[in-house]
């Protein structure tokens, strides 16, 4: 199932290159459907590819030198506001990642708070390995986590831009202080009619008028994807979620696998015949 998804992503890259338009968007076939692959009379594989490029990468928040990236911090702060999150700030996320043991502010949290938990534990002091680590953050609740999850990702690298063709309304609202929900929904409606194939066209939208929004941290391509697989065979079911990376040359490799997940396949099914 995972290898099938990789082949689909390679083919998508080749088609984009042939058309001289290196853009990833929700109207592409891989993004619209979950593939149904008959194994034999006793089994079936379901495969869904999800774009991770439209989310804010948590690991952009603190640089390799330990400095806080102001653009990412501001975007996360605006995302929290767009989602109506009031019981948590970005500061404990910074403290979770940075190498020191000093809380960044009165709203932060370092080892001192976590060691008083039952059972006690320490901060990560490194980039997030998984988005699920957010559950360990001081002040995090299941309600806040559920609200944040569709808009965030923990990639194994920093510096990956947000794909403006796949960003959610809340992520679009995080791009500038003056962006509101109506403007974000208007942008989504426009890209559903015609995707953005040039960042300058995106930045020139009337919704951004007077904001001076820059292209920093924005892109039209996606490098990381989530492959959701569900195998049913002889009445047994196995679920797996993989993170795959497609490099600028179109090669795709797996960077993370997680088994034991609940079924997360939600897209319209499309059955592939043998071969």
Predicted regions and their residues:
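Compositionally biased linear targeting/interaction segments
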Residues: 1-275
């Amino acid at each position: 199932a995972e290898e099938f998804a990789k082949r689909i992503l390679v083919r998508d890259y080749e088609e984009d290159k042939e058309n001289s338009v290196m853009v990833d968007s929700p109207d592409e076939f891989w993004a619209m459907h979950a593939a149904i692959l008959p194994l034999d009379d006793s089994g079936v594989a379901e495969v869904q590819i999800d774009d991770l490029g439209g989310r804010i990468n948590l690991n952009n928040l603190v640089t390799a030198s330990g400095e806080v990236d102001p653009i990412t911090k501001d975007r996360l702060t605006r995302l929290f506001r767009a989602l109506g999150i009031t019981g948590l700030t970005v500061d404990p996320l910074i403290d979770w990642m940075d190498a020191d043991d000093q809380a960044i502010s009165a709203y932060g949290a370092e080892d001192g708070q976590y060691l008083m938990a039952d059972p006690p534990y320490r901060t990560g002091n490194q980039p997030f390995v998984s988005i699920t680590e957010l559950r360990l953050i001081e002040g995090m609740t299941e309600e806040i986590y559920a609200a944040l999850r569709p808009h965030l990702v923990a990639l194994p690298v920093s510096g990956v831009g947000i794909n403006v063709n796949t960003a959610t309304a809340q992520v679009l609202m995080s791009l500038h202080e003056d962006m509101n929900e109506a403007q974000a929904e208007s942008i989504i409606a426009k890209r559903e009619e015609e995707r953005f194939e040039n960042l300058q066209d995106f930045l020139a939208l009337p919704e951004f008028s007077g904001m001076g929004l820059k292209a920093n941290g924005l892109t039209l391509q996606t490098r990381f994807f989530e492959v959701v697989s569900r195998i049913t065979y002889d009445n047994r079911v196995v679920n797996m979620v993989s993170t795959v990376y497609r490099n600028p040359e179109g090669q795709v490799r797996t960077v993370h696998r997680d088994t034991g997940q609940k079924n997360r396949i939600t897209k319209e099914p499309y059955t592939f015949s043998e071969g």
